[in-house]
Amino acid sequence: MGLQACLLGLFALILSGKCSYSPEPDQRRTLPPGWVSLGRADPEEELSLTFALRQQNLERLSELVQAVSDPNSPQYGKYLTLENVADLVRPSPLTLHMVQKWLLAAGAQKCHSVITQDFLTCWLSIRQAELLLPGAEFHHYVGGPTETHVVRSPRPYQLPQALAPHVDFVGGLHRFPPTSSLRQRPEPQVTGTVGLHLGVTPSVIRKRYNLTSQDVGSGTSNNSQACAQFLEQYFHDSDLAQFMRLFGGNFAHQASVTRVVGQQGRGRAGIEASLDVQYLMSAGANISTWVYSSPGRHEGQEPFLQWLMLLSNESALPHVHTVSYGDEEDSLSSAYIQRVNTELMKAAARGLTLLFASGDSGAGCWSVSGRHQFRPTFPASSPYVTTVGGTSFQEPFLITNEIVDYISGGGFSNVFPRPSYQEEAVAKFLSSSPHLPPSGYFNASGRAYPDVAALSDGYWVVSNRVPIPWVSGTSASTPVFGGLLSLINEHRILSGRPPLGFLNPRLYQQHGAGLFDVTHGCHASCLDEEVEGQGFCSGPGWDPVTGWGTPNFPALLKTLLNP
């Protein structure tokens, strides 16, 4: 049947299931650990679905990202505005017409878009949604650390073939909330009586990374930073104030968040949210801080998509964003990964520095056709973000050199090819590492991560008015590195320079300048006879465990201040 026939009587064909296709045939629909089905949803219950509309001129967008992010380019630092991006990638008039006509025929109501017009979120009843998306069958689920309730479909959905050139995917059907890169470890035993610290605090971080009491924001520049929270994770201002009273006495700081974008609940504070806010604001001290709160409170919402749409709907944004969440690449559809990667590319074009935690499963492990392979995570594997790994002190209670934190995520993407900016560094690692795992375990030609690292082991956090020790994970290292980049942006802005923007092209050109090289330790992987639980190992220069290393702030400031 030809396209013209599919266009005729479009809604009737939806109902009959003819001329249809699956946008996400590879989307995993198995139930994640810790989630339980509560049965079919009421047909009259409402949910929201997000339709990702096909964008234009993505090759040109990629070229512009390279131009504004490469210090050797005459376009370096000349970032696009949101309006520039919208004009470039906005869906075609035909796409907008086709999708809106289809939704109107299905009875979708209360639809709203974003400035770029490439996401459309609509409210429908379960009955309408199942008619609109043949094959979908909505169920209630509960799970996650906060017993979150969601509505998802365990079955694949179909779209009319006529929409294939116009819709990338529909959000709110399959993907469960992303997982956090956060762990709480048992308190280590102190041997002997001399210890310089009993856990990582802002003063420990500032001493290790060579910050002085003067390394704080001015409080007057047009500089800001942000972190994103999901899974109904909330912070409390009272916890932040107590944290600063306990640990912020030797540097100027702000004791409250400047702005919350989204919904900030009034329930118990989450350790994840508390950690992110407290260490972003103590590392990036005295800098205006936003919190993006995308709880996914309504059962049909995907919180990560909510966050991306918030970025696409505001012209003036913080310069640095840190995110401590992710999923295994293989758990997500190709359509979803590619579209999210495009959204991250759009952020890079606008001069945003996006930092993602590398994860807390080492190289990861899963079985493919009966054989173990390492398991990369996304968005850590995106070529348009700076990914942060984790380290530990070589001597647990001394502020010493750092070694690999064995849970620090890292590896090679199975989706994205190696970007040109890291070609030299990764090729050198692959040719010189004495402890390389067998080639069948990883995709040596993929985007390699992390790019940098910071301490990730043994943090103190205040949550619900209680100081909590030994919180660990790349959820800790990511806001720390982000805060230090915000301090560098402060110097750049005050001297009339643009903010750093997408950091990786510059980072790899500078070959680790301004960073402490971490050369000892390996991270975890598959527990089998061939690799015996060992993934990749660190070494001189870049490696897929700690990237280029951890920040030496005065040297990193000098390296990144010019041009």
Curated annotation (Swiss-Prot):
Q: Give the Peptidase S53 domain ranges.
A: 199-563
* Broad class of where this protein is predominantly found: other
The gene that this protein is the product of is: TPP1
Gene Ontology MF term list:
endopeptidase activity; lysophosphatidic acid binding; metal ion binding; peptidase activity; serine-type endopeptidase activity; serine-type peptidase activity; sulfatide binding; tripeptidyl-peptidase activity
> Which residues are trimmed away as propeptide when the chain matures?
20-195
GO biological process assignments: bone resorption; central nervous system development; nervous system development; peptide catabolic process; proteolysis
| Record-listed Ca(2+) binding positions | D517, V518, G539, G541, D543
Organism, as annotated: Macaca fascicularis
Q: What is this protein called?
A: Tripeptidyl-peptidase 1
Q: How does it assemble?
A: Monomer. Interacts with CLN5. Interacts with CLN3.
What are the leading ranks of the lineage? Eukaryota, Metazoa, Chordata, Craniata, Vertebrata
* Note describing how the cofactor binds: Binds 1 Ca(2+) ion per subunit.
State the needed cofactors, names only.
Ca(2+)
Which CDD domains does the record associate with it?
Peptidases_S53, Pro-peptidase_S53
